[in-house]
Amino acid sequence: MSDLFAKLMDQIEMPLDMRRSSAFSSADIIEVKVHSVSRLWEFHFAFAAVLPIATYRELHDRLIRTFEAADIKVTFDIQAAQVDYSDDLLQAYYQEAFEHAPCNSASFKSSFSKLKVTYEDDKLIIAAPGFVNNDHFRNNHLPNLVKQFEAFGFGTLTIDMVSDQEMTEHLTKNFVSSRQALVEKAVQDNLEAQKSLEAMMPPVEEATPAPKFDYKERAAKRQAGFEKATITPMIEIETEENRIVFEGMVFDVERKTTRTGRHIINFKMTDYTSSFALQKWAKDDEELRKFDMIAKGAWLRVQGNIETNPFTKSLTMNVQQVKEIVHHERKDLMPEGQKRVEFHAHTNMSTMDALPTVESLIDMAAKWGHKAVAITDHANVQSFPHGYHRARKAGIKAIFGLEANIVEDKVPISYDPVDMDLHEATYVVFDVETTGLSAMNNDLIQIAASKMFKGNIVEQFDEFIDPGHPLSAFTTELTGITDKHLQGAKPLVTVLKAFQDFCKDSILVAHNASFDVGFMNANYERHDLPKITQPVIDTLEFARNLYPEYKRHGLGPLTKRFQVSLDHHHMANYDAEATGRLLFIFLKDAREKHGIKNLLQLNTDLVAEDSYKKARIKHATIYVQNQVGLKNMFKLVSLSNIKYFEGIPRIPRTVLDAHREGLLLGTACSDGEVFDAVLTKGIDAAVDLAKYYDFIEIMPPAIYQPLVVRELIKDQAGIEQVIRDLIEVGKRANKPVLATGNVHYLEPEEEIYREIIVRSLGQGAMINRTIGRGEGAQPAPLPKAHFRTTNEMLDEFAFLGKDLAYQVVVENTQDFADRIEEVEVVKGDLYTPYIDKAEETVAELTYQKAFEIYGNPLPDIIDLRIEKELTSILGNGFAVIYLASQMLVNRSNERGYLVGSRGSVGSSFVATMIGITEVNPMPPHYVCPSCQHSEFITDGSVGSGYDLPNKPCPKCGTPYQKDGQDIPFETFLGFDGDKVPDIDLNFSGDDQPSAHLDVRDIFGDEYAFRAGTVGTVAEKTAYGFVKGYERDYGKFYRDAEVERLAAGAAGVKRTTGQHPGGIVVIPNYMDVYDFTPVQYPADDVTASWQTTHFNFHDIDENVLKLDILGHDDPTMIRKLQDLSGIDPITIPADDPGVMALFSGTEVLGVTPEQIGTPTGMLGIPEFGTNFVRGMVNETHPTTFAELLQLSGLSHGTDVWLGNAQDLIKEGIATLKTVIGCRDDIMVYLMHAGLEPKMAFTIMERVRKGLWLKISEEERNGYIDAMRENNVPDWYIESCGKIKYMFPKAHAAAYVLMALRVAYFKVHHPIMYYCAYFSIRAKAFELKTMSGGLDAVKARMEDITIKRKNNEATNVENDLFTTLEIVNEMLERGFKFGKLDLYKSDAIEFQIKGDTLIPPFIALEGLGENVAKQIVKARQEGEFLSKMELRKRGGASSTLVEKMDEMSILGNMPEDNQLSLFDDFF
């Protein structure tokens, strides 16, 4: 028996005779898991054998009883070295199992606890009667029984049930006989009753016929019963039950149709006590129509049976009846004109703290008839844009504000300093102990001080004070002071007077002096004694400024660091003496290190410029009053996030003062300085502070309730008095008092969502700091912070009297709302930056290139297209966007990289001519590179110019060049050409950082910002929060409730970030604060770029956003160019070998069986995925135009599956004729004869998935026009299925890049494989890759099997893709070499003849930095030992061992120390 286990047995007083049993001989505690919040302890014991049942029960009962006394729940399990499977022991433990949850459920226990068990063939067999639903119990209860036996110490048992025929017959016989007896008795009783009834009834002359059974009447009665049935709260349902009625809201719905045509709807409902999964089958059309009422957000009454779902294993209601009910929502019942305005409301942009979207907040205020509502998120304004748009739509005023973190710029070390020599001064170092932190609501219980001169204590003061009431346990626990200490203590006023006399002619000193001085002054004021006027030194601020490198400056940490005795921290006499010792250490260091000799110097010479970083934070609400104020607000938010960020955004008071124009200030919540002053310093001090603000905030008593739990306020009466005091402060300071709600969610029942979000922050968050100490300490409850109606607010403040309550709730809030002007948060126009002569330059570059290709004069079709585009581009101010993109592309080209275009920019011929994109949107055409003669095919017969047959120029005989993808300009800038151009560009990932810096270089650092994003809590993350809350707070939720809670907690702001390639450019004739505040991404103050504070989507129509994305294709092309010397621009788009890849593998010299796929698509961008390879196999593309179709089909939504795929399979259409890319719709319809405007509109409706959402009248108009122009019905039907379509220009750019890569795969294979593995491959397994074909194929087979069983990891899935290419490479006759310590590169694969040599980074677990370090170290000299490789190369022992296992190190010794024998030779 271990010592720890013996100690536990002593504590629970386990009987000695039981402890001496053989099972206890080696007893030990394997582990104890302590869940501090839920106060659950989990013991894991080890015993020599399974305990006798009596011993187990004794151990169980004593553990439970002992720990219950300390309010701790206990569970335990046992690991037994030897297991006894005797029938008696098993039967005893079987009976015991039904005393433990969840085996003690009523249905399981009543059916099974009396059955017999035996142990046969390594199984525990339960003999059950044959009529028991074995499948139900086997699936739902036996797993729990297995777990319980494992906890008893039997290990993992297999438990099964068998039907006992003898028992079945016996029970059946008993059942039949007992039932027969009951029937006979019932018949006899009925006869006797009938006789009695007949005796009482008058004779009947004529018998009436028996009524027929009326099914309608029965249905009506059932419906009446359903209407009147008792509603069961969902939380009360724990087992299977029949005819249960719920009422609740639907929050999840899924409709299904089975293969047999039956309809089922699965849905989830909540009544806010819990949630439930429900399902309903439709028996007929009438039942099916009822499905329509089961919609998300609907309130229903349902009746059905509760059963265990065999698939989910959870209780589910099979719904028999359903009815929609009216949900009585809260309403603001005050008359119009008498409704409040909420001035303190948080949205889900308050980081990890509040729930409502700004739209839902504004909608609720508008629905209630409020004329305005304020937005006051914590330290950010990210909800402003959406709030601005929603308020305009809802017709109410949005008041834009925030709850700021205000700090003092320089927190003084000394208060009221005078000219005094610090070395010659006398100090009174004092400390107070109190019953709480509120000077107004708590009491002084000890004042202690040490009078010191030149480091010596010359006199001491120490007095206890009787507060007149018993001390709370919390106070005693914190201070160590008991009621006994206070017996016989002097009255407070006597102690105060004596202490004032003690302090005369001295400098007062305290640690965190603002608290001690505030408490003393409040008590002096209360007893008509003079407040403190002599100088005060705060040793807390002294330490912070003198030792900024220390992380902690509390009294405890400082005394430890300076080895000052502090025997009883939080008793005033000990604290005061320790503070005095520290003071003289500080004075000595200040004199020696900083030359501080005079009291005045402490603040002037020692207080650091950045002392705001350590300053105490106070909340204030700041509101935008006018347009000037909005810009100042943006500046303040920016400064708080950029210059003054320290853990959280901070606004120094002087900075606020400098930008206060157009802003209004409120005193905020209980964390505001005015509220704090009322609590800790008194009304006079609060009045002085209140003069800084524009209004005083008071909140419902329920909001302040946590302060009672924290013992800052005594009780409800104390809260009401604080509110009255705040009103008095407003009266004295001549400031209006506004009742605000501190809204964090909209409805009362949403409180749990915030609870889950806030508690997920852990105990490190201030809001979760525990009350008291020890493992059982809990955080204070969160306040009831829902959005209150005017009536509810008036009720909250009814204690003030009707008139005063109405004034602070309604009149003052309405008046203050009227002081605030409407502002424009989001501008209505686009503001592009200015580049000198941008319009002239774009036009000049366009015509210059056009003349170069097509000659001068230009062909009419080219001239008209350029004129049309330039009219739109120059007329709408878009030239600067084009020119900026051209400059960026040109710079990247000059660095040796191609830039691929994305999106629809390839629809613009001007973009093609100035070099932004390679895609030529003109109709397919020939053009002579020598004489510029051209031929255009404009009848739609050719899909791409690259598919035109080769032919010479008829004028000069030079082979024609071929181009043109037939893409209308309208798909880029809209039909009227006024849509803001969104130019997305794919730069090489290697060159992307340089391209980003180019933007700064072109426009200036102060005008270029990364596009900001806001990261919110995803539903999966919220699910984890809910499960953590269950664990930490001892909750248990059924699956449906977990889903509901996770959905409710999702969407809350968690962090900020940046778009991977988006750069926002502010016009150089404005500044960023005209559009948005700025910040660092994810609060990373070391980031090289600042981001927009607003999500970039919120301002993307006001400023230029450049999408400078990183992509592998340009990097791959650059690598192939470096390896081959081939200019990728010269690679033909119609190379026969490349096109052959799409129809077979012969061009690669392998069979489909060798590489496992019928085509050569492996590793080709756009076409190498399993999905697209399948499309290629079905469609057999042979032209560039068909490849464009495939690209469009594979990227669209509902374009291929269930649409084009079926049309092709059924022979209705071909790959060429189906709808593939969005632009094809407009082109096809115009060729069919529709007007361009209508063709464009139809394309827009279809590509956005709106075809079935527009009105039937509008849709029929389009259909009639198409049919009039002989557009086939299948084409029209196909339009109706599409949800999203890919731009043809995007497809063309991607396909062109893909064909260039494919060219190298066909004609320069070893270079292709080198580039692929260097750039695209995501996972490596070098041992397999260098092990030959058999090893590669065996590993692929292994992963294939895992995939079928859903067991493959993400790494294995990535590895499979890599191995497919390795296999193909090996089958083509190339080799994969081993990692070479002296030849391998750090990052890139190397070509050695027909062999690839892998780089160091391909070794699993070896990162880029170590790879580069190894290469650098080997250049300095050979590695003589493994130790040297670890030391110089930076490789870990694990990596060196792995290299050794792969025979990379040869015979390298462990170390390079020579033996004594070696020295002689």
Curated annotation (Swiss-Prot):
A Gene Ontology molecular function term of the record: DNA-directed DNA polymerase activity
CDD domains xrefs: DEDDh, PHP_PolIIIA_POLC, polC_OBF
GO cellular component: cytoplasm
SUPFAM superfamilies, per the entry: Nucleic acid-binding proteins, PHP domain-like, Ribonuclease H-like
Its EC number(s): 2.7.7.7
Pfam family, one: DNA_pol3_a_NI
Residues in Exonuclease domain copies: 427-583
Keywords: Cytoplasm, DNA replication, DNA-directed DNA polymerase, Exonuclease, Hydrolase, Nuclease, Nucleotidyltransferase, Transferase
Superkingdom to which the source organism belongs: Bacteria
InterPro entries named among the record's database cross-references: DNA_pol3_alpha_NTPase_dom, DNA_pol3_finger, DNA_PolC-like_N_II, DNA_PolC-type_N_I, DnaE2/DnaE/PolC, DNAPol_HHH, DnaQ, Exonuclease_RNaseT/DNA_pol3
Gene3D superfamilies per record: 1.10.150.870, 3.30.1900.20, 6.10.140.1510, Metal-dependent hydrolases, Nucleic acid-binding proteins, PolC, middle finger domain, Ribonuclease H-like superfamily/Ribonuclease H
One Gene Ontology term from the biological process aspect of the record: DNA-templated DNA replication
Chief place of localization: cytoplasm
Compartments, as annotated in UniProt: Cytoplasm
Catalytic activity: DNA(n) + a 2'-deoxyribonucleoside 5'-triphosphate = DNA(n+1) + diphosphate
Family: Belongs to the DNA polymerase type-C family. PolC subfamily.
Function: Required for replicative DNA synthesis. This DNA polymerase also exhibits 3' to 5' exonuclease activity.
Protein known as: DNA polymerase III PolC-type
UniProt organism field: Streptococcus pyogenes serotype M6 (strain ATCC BAA-946 / MGAS10394)
